[in-house]
């Protein structure tokens, strides 16, 4: 994907996380829970420790290419059996979602 370096702070950007939570509510919550429980797609708890910020941003913004080319994404598809549809999210939306994921994983 196009993201090779994503700058994240040591502490949480609260405004960005709040914006990301709104995006989650509209675009993501029908398939993803913020716990480790699978809904349609995998739960988000711990995702920021399992995946790099770059992987997360590339997956959110370029889902099809990641599923086609990335072994970790392909393995996830085999577990969930449902291909994540492209949500047409902007780079900003994706970055805000990443910050919400970080908040969900306990970053203060």
List each language-model region with its residue ranges.
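Electrostatic cytochrome c docking/interface patches
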Residues: 1-23
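Short pre-active-site segment immediately N-terminal to redox-active cysteine/selenocysteine motifs
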Residues: 16, 24-27, 35, 83, ...
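Axial heme c-ligation environment in periplasmic c-type cytochrome domains
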Residues: 39-47, 64-94
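Gly/Gly-Pro-rich "capping" loops immediately C-terminal to redox-active cysteine motifs
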Residues: 17, 21, 33-62
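Sec-exported extracytoplasmic/periplasmic mature domains
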Residues: 25, 29, 33-36, 49, ...
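Short coil/turn linker and secondary-structure boundary residues
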Residues: 12-15, 51, 89-92
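Sequence context of c-type cytochrome heme-c attachment sites
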Residues: 7, 33, 74-76
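C-terminal capping alpha-helices of c-type cytochrome domains
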Residues: 54-58, 82-108
